[in-house]
UniProtKB/Swiss-Prot annotation:
GO terms for molecular function: metal ion binding. Pfam families: T4P_PilY1 (PF05567). Residues 443-460 have a biased composition (Polar residues). It comes from Xylella fastidiosa (strain Temecula1 / ATCC 700964). Residues 307-334, 438-460 are annotated as: Disordered. It comes from the Bacteria. This is Type IV pilus biogenesis factor PilY1 homolog PD_0023. Ca(2+) binds at residues 952, 954, 956, 958. Belongs to the PilY1 family.
Amino acid sequence: MKKTVFNPALNRAAAILIGTLVGISGVVHASVDISSSPLHGGKDVPGNLAILASVEFPTLISVANLADTYTPGVRYVGYFDSNKCYKYHYSSRELDRYFYPVASPRPQANYGCNTTGGVWAGNFLNWAATQTIDPFRSALTGGYRVRDTVSETILEKAVMDRDSQENFPRRNVAGRNVLATLVPTQWNNFRIRIDGLGNRMRFTQFSSLWTDPLNTEGQPYDSSRHPLNRNDRGVYEVSVRVKVCDPSAGLESNCVAYPRGSYKPEGLIQEYSKRIRYSVFGYKNDHSYLIDGGVLRARQKFVGPQTHYPEQGKKTNSHAEWDPQTGILYDNPDPEDAAATTRRVGRTIANSGVINYLNKSGQMDTGRISKIYDPVSELYYTAYRYFKRLGNVPEYSVLTGSVNEKYQQADAFPVITDWDDPIRYACQSNVVLGIGDTHTNQDKNLPGNTNTMEEPSKPQTVRNDRSIDVVKRMAQIFRMEGMRQQDAMTSAVAPKFNFHRYNSAYIAALAYDAHTKDMRPDLEGDQLLTTHWVDVVEAGDYKIPISTNQYWLAAKYGGFQVPAGYDPDKTVNPLSEATWWTNGEYVNNDLKANAKRADNFYVAADAEKMVASLKHAFSRIVAEIKGAGTGLSSNSARLETGAVTYQAQFFSGTWRGDLIAYHVDKVTGALTPFWNANFPAWEQRVIKFANATTLQDFTKKNLGQTALASASAQQINYLRGDRSQEGNVPGKLRIRSGIMGDIVNSQPLYVGAPNGRLYTTANFTGASAYAAFAAQQANRVPVVYVGANDGMLHAFDANTGKEIFAFVPRAAMPKLLEYTDQNYGHQYYVDGELTAADIYDTKLGWRSVLVGTLGRGGKGLFALDVTDPSNIRLLWDKTSADIGGLGNTLSKPMIAQTSDGTWSVLLGNGPNSTADNAQLIVMNLLTGHAAQVPVSKTSNNGLSGVFPWSSQSNGITDRVYAGDLLGTLWRFTFSDNAWKVAPLFTATYQGKAQPISATPLGAIERSTGRMWIFFGTGRALSSHDMDNKEVQSWYGLIDQGTTIPGRTRLSQVQIVDEGVVNGYAVRTVSDPKNIGTDGWYMDLISPKSGKQGERMIVSNMFRGAALIGTTRIPDNSDICKLSGSGFVMAINPFTGGRLGQWFFDLNTGGGSGGALNGNPVSGVGVSSAPNSPVFTGNIMQIGADDGTVTSLKTPSSGGLNINRVSWREILRTE
């Protein structure tokens, strides 16, 4: 049973999570190994990309560069290099005619050439002869290779198989001076015809080429015989082929070197071939409009020379699509599928594969022109069925007629009917990328639709599909687009959507359904499908308002960021723009609300935009393929109007980060996104770094005395957000899919206006002045702070999401240039926790300060005065060179005031310090002076999170508790202006130390006045930790002022039973009647599965009188969740045993609780490793490492005495 609510988002409490998502330490001689990337699962799992080629004649033959007038200086895209000049190679054999680049002359600044000697300008040839499918092929595959040998590669433009000036107008360039830089003529006019000429371009200087559409006369152009002088009245033709990747003339930017000395043009499919598995869907080439659906042309697979399955490593790919030594493309990489279709057709099918189909579709000489009708919604439905594993629709793939007719319908490629399962891993992301024109035809024969006008009989397999009703889904989308209910339903069943051929927008209904509802209930978690689409804009028709474009609707509703708690069936309100329109762009530069370009929608209005769109789509696709979230923070602890939740995300495909703000519904608690992190232009961003005692702008000229002194201006600008130098060729910088780096362990921190009532009863120095300070700051801009692995602390306006400033700590600089490298492997930079507080400065008065750590990113600690977020000030920026005891601080720094009046930062030093031991670090917040309190000299150790305690409940800290990685819990006492340390307890199991990673939690038992400390043991810092199955434990200790000698003075609590209640894995614990002298312990051993390495690496928390603990059970057998599963447990804090009444409501919210074999449930299982839960009212939300959230009801009042408890609000019981 699936209990997940939304994805991707990881939820956790405000308490620090140690080791939940782990990363690199950046330490040269690290004693404690810390992984360089997150360990919580899905690492290196390849994504699935299905390419939907809605290729019929407009997609193939439409003009790519739409401008009818050639403009010198404007770059036009196609197979030719705009920065090269070409000559034409004539041969009596047509197949041997082509253009080839020349080393000299070189193009002029406006892409023109000195055309004497038979030279042509490559930029002009792109404008003149490029069809829409050409840049699509170029971007995806490198282009259609008509000749592909070790020594030579020649590309050929798409076939233009019919007369159609509407799709490719006949053009003219006028003016001898202009033409002299483009073509080798002395003409005043250069008239061009492409339509109806196959792979050729015809030209003349006279209008007969235009006025006579039946003109078939054209002499093959030969520069040695045709000087094209001023009086030439001839009509000539050239074959539009071009030699590429010729080292003698300079390599194009997409040429890749191979071991045998060849260079081959490659595209995005090859570039991402190690990270994505591909499949392709297309149509049968049948000209009847009564032919339904699409067919699978190439099944989901790796296309490169090796497969890259994480559990197998690199292995030779038996279905590779190119030679690893030469780069030459194979004609038939999937011979089994070709042979199967051969048997059905009765004629040899000799071509197969993803790249081949994309390149050769419409190019094969089967004796039939390209397809006329395009039922695109049914094509999408074919892919929809593939991912849902519903099986092929036989009527879609049937081949009929004679052998030749079957061959033509197959278009000389496989028509695959024995579908496999494209989803190999439950955590794979699945993506569709489509291309087509909006003038679609007869595509309504889908589940739920009863309008059969101009449709054949609906296939029985389609009738049997009850998983979707496209009419209801479409009506729902129209409601979300603002229609009234009746109008929406009327539109959903209308005979046509936006064209006269009885088309529909059901592609959007399918895309929405697949994007928001689990496609595969048989697999763990939710399997969803994200849609990207390229509109080729047939005949320049953008379909404005854009909501009349079915591809825009499909990309919007199949690609929006699904909010937390989203109900895909009941939602009818408009989507928040923050979920689908973050690019700020408009279709066709039409600055109107009805022309906003959805993030996953791209237009091929010209070839330049086509290529840019596809590159952007792939960068987003790769980012989505490994998407996950970090955690949630809030601007309020109460559910009321104005409450906002902030979610940090990372996308490991390109290591991009994001921050999203959600409005919280005050009645239901539902989240509605209203902004994403957004940035000023890179030149205008406020980015600072510490130079001695002041802040300076993060620019090349200011960094000469830092670890970035060797960086180039391009690298520094890249770090600032300049993306103009990104690319995959030498000299370029790493391609990103966004400006901000991934956010993994840094919890977003909201800092709003001060609370003037905070210190009304306090009597320490400055307390009486706080109310005035709060009043002065009442209207300051609220800010959300978060650290990212781009080397920066980011500060965002909490109302708008716009970045106010960023800060680069010194400790992040030494390895920051790696972030710009094309071969970048994940690094951690500013990955630590943040804290903020108002402190009193006897000289300047009250100030708001922020303290941050680098966590896994390095050994650094910094403090900023953020009283005025628009004018921050540096307090200090420290590294381990300043504080010798500082290691990788993996916990939240705490700000506290001690009895001497000093405001201090308290934190555990973390592992990998210079001395390699555990120390408490106490820093004067105003001066940066650090005191180090070592607790032992034992190496391979570090102090974890600290729990400050005010024994007098006056806000003055006089005691601190913290554990270390060798299992000792320490008590630090501040007296006589000094810190004294003593061990309280050492956690062991059968004599072996149990590491303490999480911050302990304290409480006073009201009935006895005894001080209790609660914590669990275990760690998860490296893959070795994940393999470790040693027993860890949960402890509740009484601090009686002396060291607890061992377990003999503690009572034992056991996990006594496990089972399933209403689909939930549950467990119960024992109910001890006698409490040990010094507390209790519970070994995390399953009564059914035994020792599994279950551990507790996140802090405990209170919910009323219940103690909440979260455990994790690692599982290296599942690549999707290496951190495994776990339990959220609720027990009596002062006995360690089960509660006297139910805590988890497992009976469908009925309030009757849950019991296992008559005993109240003590723990609920989560299929992916859980984080600390978050409570909203009586709803408990459990965020897990796989990005899912499980929601359960808990008691709202009564015996559990529900109150919010923190270290300042101490729990006391009667």
